[in-house]
Amino acid sequence: MTVSSQSPVKKQLHNAIQPSNGQYEYHDKLSTLGMRIRQAVDNGYQGVSVHNTANNTIAATSGSNGSNSSINGAGFSNICVQDNTRFTIPEYKRVALAKQPPMLVNQRTVSMNSNLEQWEQNLDQRLSSIDDDIMRNKLGASDFLSGASKRSFDDLEF
């Protein structure tokens, strides 16, 4: 038995698939599509400034892109800009609240001031009522005081 110093060569059972460039010709463009959309929206909001609607309307109807880009100063065509001057935008006025703002609770809920002393007093009352309920409950008191233990059927009271 001789041990050879060379490692055995593995035989490939299948041929590797070669990547084709034609299949993914738009891959690079698609990977940056979201960023390009964000940039176009950002440029559109910053670049288009409508100061004089009469000049912009004339430029939009003139049909030459050179005059349109010189009117709005941003290099955008006014064909892309929406002209909503014929629609009236209602002016919203904020309604003044009453002197006492409405309560954020229903009629059954008792409203209390935010006072730490009252809260602690109510907490003490609630905790003492919980303790009383536990002590009154025969099953709960025995489980609470002696720990959880199993009972037989004979121990149950009907």
Curated annotation (Swiss-Prot):
- Per the UniProt record, one Pfam family is RNR_inhib
**What broad class describes the main subcellular location of this protein?**
cytoplasm
Q: Which GO terms describe its molecular function?
A: ribonucleoside-diphosphate reductase inhibitor activity
Q: Name one GO cellular component term.
A: cytoplasm
Instruction: Cite the entry's keywords alphabetically.
Output: Cytoplasm, Nucleus
The record's subcellular location field reads:
Cytoplasm; Nucleus
GO BP terms: protein localization
- So what does this one do? Mediates the nuclear localization of the ribonucleotide reductase.
PANTHER family, per the entry: DAMAGE-REGULATED IMPORT FACILITATOR 1, DAMAGE-REGULATED IMPORT FACILITATOR 1-RELATED
Q: Which family does it belong to?
A: Belongs to the DIF1/spd1 family.
> What is this protein's record name?
Damage-regulated import facilitator 1
What's the source species for this entry?
Kluyveromyces lactis (strain ATCC 8585 / CBS 2359 / DSM 70799 / NBRC 1267 / NRRL Y-1140 / WM37) (Yeast)
Provide the gene name from the record. DIF1
